[in-house]
From Swiss-Prot:
InterPro entries: Isoprenoid_synthase_dom_sf, Terpene_cyclase_plant_C1, Terpene_synth_N, Terpene_synth_N_sf, Terpene_synthase-like, Terpenoid_cyclase/PrenylTrfase. Expressed in roots, leaves, flowers and also in siliques. Pfam families: Terpene_synth. Changing H331A: Reduced activity, but no effect on substrate binding. Increased inhibition by Mg(2+). It comes from Arabidopsis thaliana (Mouse-ear cress). Belongs to the terpene synthase family. Tpsc subfamily. This is Ent-copalyl diphosphate synthase, chloroplastic. It comes from the Eukaryota. The gene is GA1.
Length: 802
């Protein structure tokens, strides 16, 4: 039984030619007297059956069993009851899912974030001036949002730190106004029964400032006669931690310049409010913290504080989050998630608006989670820097000098600590360094070593977020650097790592970001991945037929190499709609291998094949595009074999050109010949130079838009020179020998840095071409560096459905 694949937007069959009035350009050659003789590549119809037998033959071949044993998993995907897989993504459900995400992206404001019971309780404590709550809606929210066990906090993830500080704050607020005694007593009971459990909690997941804020709440509770075990050993330990931390707080500095201490004023004493009010944020808050701002208002009755709190309470219908706004954080992290999930192409316009927004608030000192902040952090700065640079915005690497001191990098200016995710995002950003950006070179070395050490100690736990698989994300990044990270490989792993709505952030309390951690994104990504994978499996079947029918094994191309060629193309150019680009890359790679394997040994044999190729084309033109193999000169050694392979090459180029003409009305036949002729001139002289440039040209020729006028552009020439130094087959061999691997990879890295600078700093007019160069270079770099991962990645990316 075979799997049936329904091809949406299928390539017209050759029989369509006879029934159409379209005139094919004269540059399509006619070989051996047939109307259009192309390298044989069948199975072009509206509904195509992907042969189980052919795939089974591939799996059972001794060669593949030796080289790629993990492909046996593909057998399990083609059982007797295998379902039909729809290739494409134009179903109504898929379109609606895309539309829903677009709606989210088009309506981003100050950030969607869950309400914090702790911060709401601080707002509820504010006196209107007449012994009544200034924010009765906050009191009401507390009363209506108690959990069934008597606590307050995140309802889906139980953390004693989170539940106890939220519960104590809410109990204090209700008792202060003598309201809702039943809820208050339930909360006290929960607190008394569970306070001892703090001893067993992981300090890494302790809320921000817990050791300062929690004792302060206990003092308020004691003052209003709330009966809790104040002499509990665990509370004594927390008091000791508070005193230690308070002694380390630079009181003089915190009153002069904005620091993260402004976020947690409610836990401090002996504050000079006249000085602190000068450090207030533009929106009236103290570093965007409702609880800190509520405490400040109680001490100062400042009208700007009150206005901020009123806006927050109104925005969240009575409650307030632990931090607000979070606009920059939300904009940046959404783009990152959509990009890593492999679905960003559906939202290009919306993503540009997101990044325009972030760039508008970018400063030389960096950014933080909210706009117009006087305090910046390395986490948001690194994430924004990476995305902005990737998308062509001009941002300076000097921004990271603000977070560096004596060779180390820190989360906040003036502090001396790191967080795993902060260093992870610094590491990711540092890999987009341009040559001569020493600060990023230092950042890469520091963050890599930091993460490596944390992984070795099994300490990949973060103080900012509880994630599904943070160790997996970091492990992937450490093993597959960005230069070698292919889009489909990253997405295949990230789909398994992304926790969606189950990921929880850690602030003063646990909180969630529904537009950042969204199950809808995950489901859309899974469906899109499976759609693309089905298309790839269909193409892989066609690709094998082309290989067999043209007997390419006779020219030294093994089946395992065939799969590697297709995989590199599909893992890089993965989109279903880019089939022409993907297939031309894969076939061109195989043909280069066949030609080099059969005729690359000596300059004479290379020259012989090159002459045969050019003679094929010249004869065709002399005979009005009709010629027969009998017209070819066969007096040179090996010319029969050369003639056959040249025929396969030209036939394949004809088919590529024909397919593009039928689907997009563009005739690129002569340009295909010229591109291969240019490659042969380099190959004839040097043996293995020019393959990278050839692949880029092939891909560009197959694009929907005509970019061929860039082939003579000085920028193109510079990029071509670089990629031809990266994409040298002899380098792969050296890279896989332990004694030369490090030296070879460093040499390639140097060229990759030049490539990144040229590709990412280019204007919109040349950007598509530049990114194509970068994509191809990354694929070659991946092949040289990641040989140990190749089998696993091929199996996972091409054959394992998500």
């Amino acid at each position: 039984m075979s799997l049936q694949y329904h091809v949406l937007n299928s390539i017209p069959s050759t029989t369509f030619l006879s029934s159409t009035k379209t005139t094919i350009s004269s540059s399509f050659l006619t070989i051996s007297g047939s109307p259009l003789n192309v390298a044989r590549d069948k199975s072009r119809s509206g509904s195509i059956h992907c042969s189980k037998l052919r795939t089974q033959e591939y799996i059972n071949s001794q060669e593949v069993q030796h080289d790629l044993p993990l492909i046996h998993e593909w057998q399990q995907l083609q059982g007797e009851d295998a379902p039909q897989i729809s290739v494409g993504s134009n179903s109504n459900a898929f379109k609606e899912a895309v539309k829903s995400v677009k709606t989210i992206l088009r309506n981003l404001t100050d950030g969607e974030i869950t309400i914090s019971a702790y911060d709401t309780a601080w707002v509820a404590l504010i006196d209107a001036g007449d012994k009544t709550p200034a924010f009765p809606s906050a009191v009401k929210w507390i009363a209506e949002n108690q959990l069934s066990d008597g606590s307050w906090g995140d309802a889906y993830l139980f953390s004693y730190h989170d539940r106890l500080i939220n519960t104590l704050a809410c109990v204090v607020a209700l008792r202060s106004w003598n309201l809702f005694p039943h809820q208050c007593n339930k909360g006290i009971t929960f607190f008394r029964e569970n306070i001892g459990k703090l001893e067993d909690e992981n300090d890494e997941h302790m809320p921000i400032g817990f050791e300062v804020a929690f004792p302060s709440l206990l003092e308020i509770a004691r003052g209003i006669n709330i009966d809790v075990p104040y002499d509990s050993p665990v509370l004594k330990d927390i008091y000791a931690k508070k005193e230690l931390k308070l002694t380390r707080i630079p009181k003089e500095i915190m009153h002069k310049i904005p620091t993260t201490l402004l976020h947690s004023l409610e836990g401090m004493r002996d504050l000079d409010w006249e000085k602190l009010l000068k450090l207030q944020s533009q929106d009236g808050s103290f570093l965007f913290s409702p609880s800190s701002t509520a405490f400040a208002f109680m001490q100062t009755r400042d009208s700007n504080c009150l206005e901020y709190l009123r806006n927050a309470v109104k925005r969240f219908n009575g409650g307030v989050p632990n931090v607000f706004p979070v606009d920059l954080f939300e904009h940046i992290w959404i783009v990152d998630r959509l990009q890593r999930l492999g679905i960003s192409r559906y939202f290009e316009e919306e993503i540009k608006e997101c990044l325009d927004y972030v760039h508008r608030y970018w400063t030389d000192n960096g950014i933080c989670w909210a706009r117009c902040s006087h305090v910046q952090d390395i986490d948001d700065t690194a994430m924004a820097f990476r995305l902005l640079r990737q998308h062509g915005y001009q941002v300076s690497a000097d921004v990271f000098k603000n977070f560096e001191k004596e060779g180390e990098f820190f989360c906040f200016v003036g502090q001396s600590n790191q967080a795993v995710t902060g260093m992870f995002n610094l590491y990711r950003a540092s890999q987009l360094a341009f040559p001569r950006e020493e600060i990023l070179k230092n950042a890469k070395e520091f963050s890599y070593n930091y993460l490596l050490e944390k992984r070795e100690r099994e300490e990949l736990i973060d103080k900012w977020i509880i994630m599904k698989d943070l160790p997996g994300e970091i492990g992937f990044a450490l093993e597959i650097p960005w230069y070698a990270s292919l889009p489909r490989v990253e997405t295949r792993f990230y789909i398994d790592q992304y926790g969606g709505e189950n990921d929880v952030w850690i602030g003063k309390t646990l909180y969630r970001m529904p537009y950042v951690n969204n199950n809808g994104y995950l489901e859309l990504a899974k469906q899109d991945y499976n759609n693309c994978q089905a298309q790839h499996q269909l193409e892989w079947d066609i690709f094998q037929k082309w290989y067999e029918e043209n007997r390419l094994s006779e020219w030294g191309v093994r089946r395992s190499e065939l799969l590697e060629c297709y995989y590199l193309a599909a893992a890089t150019i993965f989109e279903s709609e880019r089939s022409h680009e993907r297939m031309v890359w894969a076939k061109s790679s195989v043909l280069v291998k066949a030609i080099s394997s059969s005729f690359g040994e000596s300059s004479d044999s290379r020259r012989s094949f090159s002459d045969q190729f050019h003679e094929y084309i010249a004869n065709a033109r002399r005979s009005d595009h009709h010629f027969n193999d009998r017209n070819m000169r066969l007096d040179r050694p090996g010319s029969v074999q050369a003639s056959r392979l040249a025929g396969v090459l030209i036939g394949t180029l004809n088919q590529m050109s024909f397919d593009l003409f039928m689907s997009h009305g563009r005739d690129v036949n002569n340009l295909l010949y010229l591109s291969w002729g240019d490659w042969m001139e380099k190959w004839k002289l040097y043996g293995d130079e020019g393959e990278g440039e050839l692949m880029v040209k092939m891909i560009i020729l197959m694009k929907n838009n005509d970019l061929t006028n860039f082939f003579t552009h000085t920028h193109f020439v510079r990029l071509a020179e670089i990629i031809n130094r990266i994409c040298l087959p002899r380098q792969y061999l050296k890279a896989r020998r332990n004694d030369e691997k490090e030296k070879t990879i460093k040499s390639m890295e140097k060229e990759m840095g030049k490539m990144v600078e040229l590709a990412l700093s280019e204007s919109d007019t040349f950007r598509d071409v530049s990114i194509t160069f970068l994509d191809v270079a990354k694929a070659f770099y991946y092949f040289a560096l990641c040989g140990d991962h190749l089998q696993t990645h091929i199996s996972k990316v091409l054959f394992q459905k998500v």
